[in-house]
């Protein structure tokens, strides 16, 4: 083509595409222009109510509102049939009723296993139940009972009511009853009385009894028992014994003789009030399996005959659902207070009064909505609600306790953006890419890329950059290693700064709960900032990675055109060729530049980006690392979608 005149020469280039509608994205080793951009993650909003992390590893404990055997089910229920099947429930029951067994009340054997335990019960022992038995108001005992249940349940996989403890009682006592207990008494503790004969023995004999907490109850292993240590409280010695006998005492000892519970008015003062009727107090004891003794002053013996047994094998979430009556019945809020004062317990509360569908007390629509999440699996459960989206960020701080892969609080504008839509690489600047410098295209070369990114928990991994021929451009092994070294160093700097900040915060810890909550919030904010910083570094490396990969693909594309042209076209600059219009007509040019039009012009897809966080971002900044794999997929015959610019 040396003899061609200027009129016979035609210059064909890839058309310039970049204009003011493109945005520039800077990265490590290369930059990109893009028609669109999007945030690496969107903010998620938690859904109010309860959910679970795994449908196969949770269990519920309930009453008529979760009881499938109730004659009004499902209208009587606050959960779906699917969820009700996960509950151990009986209408009229509650864990506390089964623990104490007041006369005339439902006595249900609560037992079951699950990593996550959901409690929706308690209303059946409330002021409306009007249970007396030497105590007009049981709310404080209920509060301590529920709190102990939640605490031990959070540390156990299995729990069970033990409704019959082995015991040995003294011969001089017999089962007693009380007028203020429906002329009966509780099943636990059992009341034993001693008849005193004034002529023979004015004061009676001291009572000595024994009970055994088993290591196993049926198929349930027992590492720890919840035992109610009950005793009477007298205002004065005279109220207890008008005959002038000794002081009142009811004390529990372990096998070594150590006092583990009870009251001893021989060393502790009476209340000093003016009442003439005792009240009963019950303390919640956490005791190991073994043989225990009970010593009491004459006349009365309160004997532990039941317990709740826990295997203490697995820590897990606990959810307590507010259990209150509808209109016309008095409720207490012991469940609420117990959960809020127990670490690891998430409380589900209503915002409106209970309004039932089946009756005033069964089938509340608001509660159904709050518990509908139990039908699904969530990535995160917290006091603020549950989340099943994959984003690591939420607009507002999620209140603890929280479990799973919980998002961190962040502002939308702080989340890094990645290029989207049509992508155009700029000239590379990475000094580790040594060849082919002369082959790297400029900003006006158009290409389409599909990106898939997966972030997994395994340490920083390698990049998949597509094919790279020895004669082509792109990133070298040394370049990739240096890129990873840089991102690794930068992330370590971020994490080091975060750890320093946490150490400073540790110095400010006080023993009050608010200070600890404030500290937790500040630590989480530091982790959020560190994660955002890490994502910024990842974004920059990904942009550079895409840019270099696209540059390589463009070089390979130009090489293919040059090879097809042979002597019919001369490459005068990257992406531009001179041809003889007389020798190579339109069909010839179609063969060279449009591959004989055998490939259809593709519909230009947007950048397809997916980022999945497999580790818990709440703990990022510790020993967990990040691994990134990125793959670029290009259309096989991209040239068919590229416009041609002709000049003479």
UniProtKB/Swiss-Prot annotation:
What is annotated as the active site? 64, 359, 362
Into which EC class is this enzyme placed? Answer: hydrolase
Where does the source fall among the domains of life? Viruses
Q: Which residues lie on this side of the membrane: Cytoplasmic?
A: 645-648
Stored Pfam families: Hema_esterase (PF03996), Hema_HEFG (PF02710), Hema_stalk (PF08720)
The UniProt annotation puts the region (Esterase domain-2) at 303-357
Which species expresses this protein natively?
A: Influenza C virus (strain C/Nara/2/1985)
Name of the featured protein: Hemagglutinin-esterase-fusion glycoprotein
Question: Which lineage do the record's taxonomy fields give for this organism?
Answer: Viruses, Riboviria, Orthornavirae, Negarnaviricota, Polyploviricotina
What does UniProt give as the signal peptide span?
Answer: 1-7
- Location of the region described as Fusion domain-2 in the Swiss-Prot/TrEMBL record: 358-643
């Amino acid at each position: 083509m040396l003899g061609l005149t200027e009129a016979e020469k035609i210059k064909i280039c890839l058309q310039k595409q970049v204009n003011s509608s493109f945005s520039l994205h800077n990265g490590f080793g290369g930059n990109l222009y893009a028609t669109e951009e999007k945030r690496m993650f969107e903010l998620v909003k938690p859904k109010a109510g309860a959910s679970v992390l795994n449908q196969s590893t949770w269990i519920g404990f309930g009453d008529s509102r979760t009881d499938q055997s109730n004659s009004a089910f499902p209208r009587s229920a606050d959960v779906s049939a699917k969820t009700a099947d996960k509950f151990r429930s009986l209408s009229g029951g509650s864990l506390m009723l089964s623990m104490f067994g007041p006369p005339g009340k439902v006595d249900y054997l609560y037992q079951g296993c699950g990593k996550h335990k959901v409690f929706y019960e308690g209303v059946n022992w409330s002021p409306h139940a009007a249970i007396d038995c030497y105590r007009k108001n049981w709310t404080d005992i209920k509060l301590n009972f529920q709190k102990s249940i939640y605490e031990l349940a959070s540390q156990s996989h299995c729990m069970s009511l033990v409704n019959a403890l082995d015991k040995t009682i003294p011969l001089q006592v017999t089962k007693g009853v009380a007028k203020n207990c429906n002329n009966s008494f509780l099943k636990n503790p059992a009341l034993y009385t001693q008849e005193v004969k004034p002529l023979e023995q004015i004061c009676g004999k001291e009572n000595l009894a024994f009970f055994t907490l088993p290591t196993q109850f049926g198929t349930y292993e027992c590492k720890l028992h919840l035992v109610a240590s009950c005793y009477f409280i007298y205002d004065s010695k005279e109220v207890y014994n008008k005959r002038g006998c000794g002081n009142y005492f009811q004390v529990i000892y372990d096998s070594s003789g150590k006092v583990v519970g009870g009251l001893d008015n021989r060393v502790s003062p009476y209340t000093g009030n003016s009442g003439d009727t005792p009240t009963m107090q019950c303390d919640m004891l956490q005791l190991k399996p073994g043989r225990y003794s009970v010593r009491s002053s004459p006349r009365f013996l309160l004997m532990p005959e039941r317990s709740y047994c826990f295997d203490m094998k697995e820590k897990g979430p606990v959810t307590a659902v507010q259990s209150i009556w509808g209109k016309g019945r008095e409720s207490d809020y012991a469940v609420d207070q117990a959960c809020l004062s127990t670490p690891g317990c998430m409380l589900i509360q209503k915002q409106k009064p209970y309004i039932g569908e089946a009756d005033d007390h069964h089938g509340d629509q608001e509660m159904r909505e709050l518990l509908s999440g139990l039908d699904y699996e969530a990535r995160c459960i917290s006091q603020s609600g549950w989340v099943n989206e994959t984003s690591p960020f939420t607009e507002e701080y999620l209140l603890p306790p929280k479990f799973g892969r919980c998002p961190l609080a962040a502002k939308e504008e702080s989340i890094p953006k990645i290029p989207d839509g049509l992508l155009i690489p700029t000239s590379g600047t990475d000094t580790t890419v040594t060849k082919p410098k002369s082959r790297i295209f400029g900003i006006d070369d158009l290409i389409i890329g599909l990106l898939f990114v997966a972030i997994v928990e395994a340490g920083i991994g390698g990049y998949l950059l597509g094919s790279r021929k020895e004669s082509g451009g792109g990133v070298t092994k040394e370049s990739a290693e240096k890129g990873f070294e840089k991102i690794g160093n930068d992330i370590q700097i971020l994490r080091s700064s975060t750890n320093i900040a946490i150490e400073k915060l540790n110095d400010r810890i006080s023993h009050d709960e608010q200070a600890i909550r404030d500290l937790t919030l500040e630590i989480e904010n530091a982790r959020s900032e560190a994660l955002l910083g890490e994502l910024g570094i990842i974004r920059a490396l990904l942009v550079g990675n895409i840019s270099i990969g696209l540059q390589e693909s463009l070089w390979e594309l130009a090489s293919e055109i040059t090879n097809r042209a042979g002597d019919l076209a001369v490459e005068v600059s990257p992406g531009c060729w001179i041809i003889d219009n007389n020798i190579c007509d339109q069909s010839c040019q179609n063969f060279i530049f449009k591959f004989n039009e055998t490939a259809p012009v593709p519909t230009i897809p947007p950048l397809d980006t997916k980022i999945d966080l497999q580790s818990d971002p709440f703990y990022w900044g510790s020993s967990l690392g990040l691994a990134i794999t990125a793959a670029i997929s290009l259309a096989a015959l991209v040239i068919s979608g590229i416009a041609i610019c002709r000049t003479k």
